[in-house]
Design a protein with these regions (language model features):
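A short, flexible loop at the N-terminus of ABC-type nucleotide-binding domains that lies
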Residues: 1-22, 27, 55
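Helix-to-loop junction immediately C-terminal to a conserved catalytic motif
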Residues: 49
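Conserved ABC transporter NBD signature motif
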Residues: 57-73
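Q-loop/switch helix immediately C-terminal to the Walker
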Residues: 83, 89-105
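Conserved ABC ATPase "signature" region
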Residues: 97, 101, 111-129
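Conserved ABC ATPase signature
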Residues: 133-138
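Catalytic Walker B motif of ABC-type/P-loop ATPase nucleotide-binding domains
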Residues: 158-162
Length: 210
C-alpha cells in the first residue's frame, strides 16, 4: 500500500497564508479536505501530489516502507479538478488516449494490476459519447470525462477536487458509487470539498478552517 506523511507544511502567497505547520498522515480510505472557499483546499491537493511547490515542510510518499520515486508516483496517481482541460477538437476517446500516451502511462508500475481492464467510459456512463468532440459536451458530461480519464490510469492514489462540480443528482450518485468501489479496491483517496454530502463519503476530514 502507498502511504502519505506530510510534516509541517506551509504555503502562502504574497499577502495571504493558506496553511502553516500542517502535519497529517493518510494510509487508507478517503481523506476529506474541508474548508471555505480560498482556504487552500485545492492548493494542498496540488502540493501533496507534487504538482505545486510548498514553501516549507516535507511530503513523504512510501510503499511498504520504501520511499516512492517521483516518476513512479506521477504514474500512480489520478487527478480530477475544475481547471483541468482537454483538447476541444479531439473526441473523448482521443483525449483519453492522448493523455495516457503523453503521461508515459505504464500499468506495470505502482498502479494496481487489473486482470480485466475496466471500461471507464462505460463505468462513468458516457460510453455513447466516446466519439463526440470534447467541446460539444455539457459541463456535467465534461466532468464525467475528467473522472473517466483519471480512472483509466488505474491509479493507486486519486485526488478529487470538488468532484461533484457541475454534476446533477445522478452524477453525484455516481461519485458515491465510484468512491465506494475504489475504497474497497484499496485506492488511496483525497477529496477536497466544502459540500457536506461529499464530505459524508470520507473516512476522516482535515478541516483547513480549524
Amino acid at each position: 500500500m502507498i502511504e502519505l506523511k506530510a510534516v509541517q507544511l506551509r504555503k502562502q502567497y504574497t499577502h495571504r497564508r493558506l496553511f502553516s505547520e500542517l502535519s497529517f498522515e493518510h494510509r487508507s480510505g478517503v481523506l476529506g479536505i474541508a474548508g471555505a472557499n480560498g482556504s487552500g483546499k485545492s492548493t494542498l491537493l496540488r502540493c501533496i501530489a507534487f504538482l505545486q511547490s510548498i514553501d516549507a515542510g516535507e511530503i513523504h510518499w512510501t510503499q511498504e516502507g520504501n520511499a516512492v520515486d517521483r516518476e513512479d508516483f506521477r504514474q500512480a496517481i489520478g487527478f480530477v479538478a475544475p481547471n483541468i482541460q482537454f483538447y476541444d477538437e479531439l473526441t473523448v476517446q482521443e483525449n483519453m488516449d492522448f493523455v495516457k500516451k503523453m503521461s508515459g502511462f505504464d500499468p506495470h508500475k505502482i498502479s494496481h494490476n487489473q486482470a480485466h481492464p475496466v471500461d471507464w467510459l462505460a463505468k462513468t456512463q458516457i460510453k455513447d459519447l466516446a466519439e463526440y468532440p470534447y467541446q460539444r459536451l455539457s459541463t456535467g458530461q465534461q466532468q464525467r470525462v475528467k473522472l473517466a480519464i483519471a480512472l483509466s490510469r488505474n491509479p493507486s492514489v486519486l485526488f478529487l477536487d470538488e468532484p461533484g462540480a457541475n454534476l446533477d443528482a445522478l452524477g453525484k450518485d455516481l461519485i458515491k458509487e465510484l468512491l465506494t468501489d475504489l475504497r474497497k479496491k484499496g485506492t488511496l483517496l483525497f477529496l477536497a470539498s466544502n459540500d457536506p454530502k461529499e464530505l459524508d463519503l470520507c473516512d476522516r476530514i482535515l478541516d483547513l478552517d480549524h
